UniProtKB/Swiss-Prot annotation:
Main location: membrane
Protein name per the record: UPF0060 membrane protein YnfA
Segments crossing the lipid bilayer: 6-26, 31-51, 61-81, 85-105
NCBIfam families: PRK02237.1 (NF002586)
Protein's UniProt keywords contain Nuclease: no
Annotated membrane topology: Multi-pass membrane protein
Location relative to the cell: Cell inner membrane
UniProt gene name: ynfA
UniProt topological domain (Periplasmic) ranges: 1-5, 52-60, 106-108
GO CC annotations, alphabetized: plasma membrane
Native organism: Escherichia coli O157:H7
């Protein structure tokens, strides 16, 4: 379970970085060269998704819960936005859903 969760967090980080770098280029006039590491990060994101031992739809559904948490950590650390009660409650609910799906992997 811990290995799966850590893999999901690494996957989410790759996806967020892969999307954030082009965002910097488009919104903040950063260097176009950021598209190169963005592409690499997104390719790594896709590869990491293939490492999970479950059907792709289950992986994507469970991954969504961890993605929400990772995105909010990004919001706090990178964007510097203070998290609200709602920002904490939403991921808690999402992680409960992720946990139900992952626990069920071995039972189907």
């Amino acid at each position: 379970m811990i290995k799966t969760t850590l893999l999901f967090f690494a996957t989410a980080l790759c996806e967020i970085i892969g999307c954030f770098l082009p965002w910097l280029w488009l919104k903040r006039n950063a260097s176009i060269w950021l598209l190169l590491p963005a592409g690499i990060s997104l390719a790594l994101f896709v590869w990491l998704l293939t490492l999970h031992p479950a059907a792709s739809g289950r992986v994507y559904a469970a991954y969504g819960g961890v993605y929400v948490c990772t995105a909010l950590m990004w919001l706090r650390v990178v964007d510097g936005v203070k998290l609200t009660l709602y920002d904490w409650t939403g991921p808690l609910i999402a992680l409960c859903g992720m946990l139900i799906i992952v626990v069920g992997w071995g039972r189907t």
